[in-house]
Each structure stands twice: as C-alpha cells, then as structure tokens.
C-alpha cells in the first residue's frame, strides 16, 4: 500500500514539475528573443543614424554647391555690368577731352574750323547717353518658406509590427528580414488564407538599392512552414503569371539575341571563308527555369547553329597551301642582326635594382646613364606610347653630338643654346648631301655605298678574306687588259684545261719534286704567266657592289689555287679509294666544288690557309 501511495504521489508531483519546466523554458526563450530584439534594435539604430547623417550631409553638399554656383553667377553679372559701364565711361572721357581742347583753342584764337569741330562734337554728345546704360540693381530672391518647410518635413521614421507566429520562433533569421527594410518605406502586412505573409513578386527581383546604409545579408528561414508549398490565392496567381511573363520575355530576348549573333557569325564566316579554316562550333541556349520558350516550334535549331564541317573539308587543300605560303613568308622577312647580339649590361641590372658603383674615371664606359633617372620619369600616356611606336624606326639625318657647336653638346636640337640653331645648318648640309652636292652646292660624284648586310655581318663574324684583299687591292684593271686576258684564254690549247694523270705510288719522296717541276712549267707557259696578273673577280657577275670589283689582289691567283687543289686531290687517299678517272671532275671550277664536298683529308692544309705560290 505504501508503495502505491508513493507512486501516486510522485505522479501527481510530476505534472506540476513538467509544467514548471515548460514555463521556464518558454520564459528563457522569450527572454532570449527579447534580448536579441534589443540587440537588433541597437544595430538598427546605428544603421538609421548613419542613413540620416549620410542623407542630410549629401543634401548639405548640394546646398553648398548651389551656394557656390550662385556666387559664380553674381560675379559673372558683375563683370558684364562693369564692362558696359567702363565702355560708356571711356566714350564720355574721350568726348570730354575733345571739349576741353576746343575750349582752350577758342579762348586763344578764333577760327571757323574750330566752330565746325564744335558742331561735330555736339552732335556726338547728342547721340551719347548721359545716364548709366546698365542698372545697378542686383537682388537675391529665395523662397525661404518652401525651403524651411521642406527641411522641417524632410525624412520620416516608420516601424513595422512583427507577426505573432514569427515571434514564437523569435530569432535573428526571422526578425532580420523585417528589420532590414528601407527606413522611409513601410511594408503593410499581407496575410494569405494560411496565415503566412505573402511577399510581392517585385521584392524577389533585383532592384535599385539606396547607395547609403548597410544591408544585412539574406539568411534563410528556419521555420519549416516557410519551406512548404502554400495554397495559391488570387494574389499568388497574379504573381505567378507575372513570373511567367517575365521568363517569357527573357526567353524572347535571348532568342532575339541568338538571331543577332547568328547574323554576325555568318557574315564573319563568309568573310574568312577563303582565308582561314573555321572550326565547327555551336551555340547552346540555357533553359530559363522550367518555362518553355515561345515560338519554339516555329524556329528550327539549324537556323542558328553554325556547323560548317563539310565546307571545312572541301576547303582544306586550298587553306593548307595558303598556310604553307604564309609560313614560307616568314623566311623572306628582313631581320636585324643586332637583335641576335648580346646587349650591353645595364648598370641597374643587378640584385635589388641598385646601380653599380662606378669610378669617376670610368664614367665614359657607361652605356645607360639614363637608367638612373627611370624612376623620375613620368608615366607614359597612350599618346606618348603611340609617338614612341611611330618613331621607333626613325633615324635622324644627323646626330646632335656631331653637329652642335656649343662647349657642352646639347641633348636635342630643341635645347640648342647657340645663336643660330644647329638643326637648320645640319639639315641644310644633309639635304645637299642627299642631292649629291657639297657644302657649296657643287655636284659631287656619288660614291658607291657598301652593302648593308656585310656591315652587319662583320659585327659578329670573323673578318673575311675579301675585306682584307680589298684593303690591299691595287687600282682597277683597264678594259684593254681584260680583253687581252680573254684573248690569251681563247687562244690557249684545250689540253691546258684537262686534269693531269695521277702519279704512281712507291715514290712519295718524289712528289714534291714533281710538284715543283709542274709549278715551274706552269709559270713558263704563256697562259700561266697571263693568269698570274689576271684578276678573276672581273669575270664574276657583280651584285650591288659595282665599284669594288677590281680591287681584289692579283697576288692571290685563284686559278692557280684551283689547279693546286686538283693536284692535292689527285695525290690524296681519296683518289686511291675511289680510283676516279682523270677526266672525272671536268673543269677546274667543278673539281674545286666537288673537292669541298667529298675530301676526307685534313682540310686545314688547303681550306683555311693560303697555299704558297710556286
């Protein structure tokens, strides 16, 4: 019995305990909601004050700007009136001076001409206005009553009532969207049949927000009822129809945009049809929501999808040949050898971009003195960049350092400090030089200009043999001497042009003797004697260098060098391996050509060294 009574007593005490715990939990939740609301009100207070300050400050700036504008207008009106009155005063002063002169002359002498002048001055006086031509009244009118009323009634503060069902789940996520509304706009409560606040469709669209004021980020609701599908009322059906119209308009705009893109792509495709290959591509349109695009059956996708695979295959050979020709064009483009040469190190090309320490005695070795001033140079504007691009390949006809007559040469002609600008004199001399005249205007025989590519190649190649020979070359041969040499060659027997039979093996020590005898026989024959003084460069077809053909040295007899190469080839192991016939090589020039290609002996003996003359 006692146990039953204890159980009944405990069950009777449990119900009040549960009620107390529920009430305490509700109170704690309510207190938490109130505290959060208080904190949100404080935050909202700061936001509203910031909005008020920003709005008032901006309108005060507008008033200040209006004040400055009115000051400028007053100054402008004052200047106009002052100029008008000054012109009138000048005319009156001029006429007053004339009357003073006439009065003085009339007091001294009596002359009829003076009477005529007096009448003219009186007529001018009658035509002038003696009163000020412009008024001196300048007033400022302001509708202070309207301005004061507008200022006193400017702005308003409104608040909204939070729905009860949201107060039950009071949280920052639920209260936030209602507290972050604009300060000057109040949203009336719109309850649907289910009791949920219906938000208009316009609130879901991206609209213009005020520039000032902090907008809290959107936080999704934690209430499950907000995520369930609600029954559509009349207003909800209207908003859904507006959504359909909106998406239809978006789809129509996209469709028109695709048609516009189709035209431009087709036109550009037709332009580049014969020039370059076009890769197949297609334009895909995203579906906007679940709404179908209008007029989808009327429009075929093939009308705006561009897929030119077949035409691309047909044009492939032609375009391939064109691409090949474009690639070969690169081989014939002009180039500058200086682009391949090593550039001089900049004095700022070190770690930390700090200039190197240079002694005063070695300042002349610096190539980039202006690099130290790069930090002080102003930033280049687009116009300056365009000018630099236009003049990057421009070469001045004369240098300032070579022309300037000042003690310290100027950096440019514009900064020349001479009495007469050096640029004019230098330009005059340059024009005379271009016309083929000297400084006195007399015509001068033009000197042949050396080839440009040779100068560029000599910058980084070893000095060539021709350049050395040209410095030591004698005067040009006369035409009669060339004709005599040609006559000697024409009358020479054909046996002189054939290759001699090779020498037998077993007597290697006699080879130098036979070569000496062969050399002596060469000098004894009239043809060989004529070749010694005969310059073969006169028989070579010249390029652009017409004046330096006869400057080659006659001591370097190339015909003898070719015959010497024959003998070296016939006595070399190459002849023993292949057993070439005596007339295998033909003329000496052909022999020399193939010897350069097939000779396996040490080329240092005859290719890079000049053979000794016998």
UniProtKB/Swiss-Prot annotation:
Q: Site Breakpoint for rearrangement to form RET/PTC3 oncogene: which residues?
A: 238-239
What post-translational events are described?
Answer: NCOA4 levels may be regulated via HERC2-mediated ubiquitination leading to proteosomal degradation; HERC2 association is dependent on NCOA4 iron occupancy.
Record protein name field: Nuclear receptor coactivator 4
Reported function: Cargo receptor for the autophagic turnover of the iron-binding ferritin complex, playing a central role in iron homeostasis. Acts as an adapter for delivery of ferritin to lysosomes and autophagic degradation of ferritin, a process named ferritinophagy. Targets the iron-binding ferritin complex to autolysosomes following starvation or iron depletion. Ensures efficient erythropoiesis, possibly by regulating hemin-induced erythroid differentiation.
Gene Ontology annotations of biological process type: cellular response to estrogen stimulus; cellular response to testosterone stimulus; estrogen receptor signaling pathway; intracellular iron ion homeostasis; male gonad development; protein targeting to lysosome; response to hormone
Tissue localization of expression is: Widely expressed. Also detected in adipose tissues and in different cell lines. Isoform Beta is only expressed in testis.
GO MF assignments: transcription coactivator activity
The terms describing its cellular component in GO are: autolysosome; autophagosome; chromosome; cytoplasmic vesicle; nucleoplasm; nucleus
Give me the ranges of the annotated region Interaction with ferritin heavy chain FTH1. 383-522
Q: Where in the cell is it found?
A: Cytoplasmic vesicle, Autophagosome; Autolysosome; Nucleus; Chromosome
Oligomer and partners: Interacts with the ferritin complex, an oligomeric structure composed of varying combinations of ferritin heavy chains and ferritin light chains. Interacts (via C-terminus) with ferritin heavy chain FTH1 (via 'Arg-23'); thereby targeting the iron-binding ferritin complex to autolysosomes following starvation or iron depletion. Interacts with ferritin light chain FTL. Interacts (via C-terminus) with ATG8-like proteins GABARAP and GABARAPL1; thereby mediating localization to autophagosomes and ferritinophagy. Interacts with MAP1LC3C/LC3C and GABARAPL2.
Q: Which domain of life is it from?
A: Eukaryota
Q: What induces it?
A: Down-regulated by nutrient deprivation (at protein level).
Instruction: Cite the record's Basic and acidic residues compositional bias ranges.
Output: 502-519
Pfam families given in the database record: ARA70
Supply the alphabetized keyword list.
Activator, Chromosomal rearrangement, Chromosome, Cytoplasmic vesicle, Lysosome, Nucleus, Proto-oncogene, Transcription, Transcription regulation, Ubl conjugation
Q: Which disease is it linked to?
A: A chromosomal aberration involving NCOA4 is found in papillary thyroid carcinomas (PTCs). Inversion inv(10)(q11.2;q11.2) generates the RET/NCOA4 (PTC3) oncogene.
**InterPro entries according to UniProt:** NCoA-4 (IPR039947), NCOA4_N (IPR022174)
Q: Where is this region: Disordered?
A: 501-524
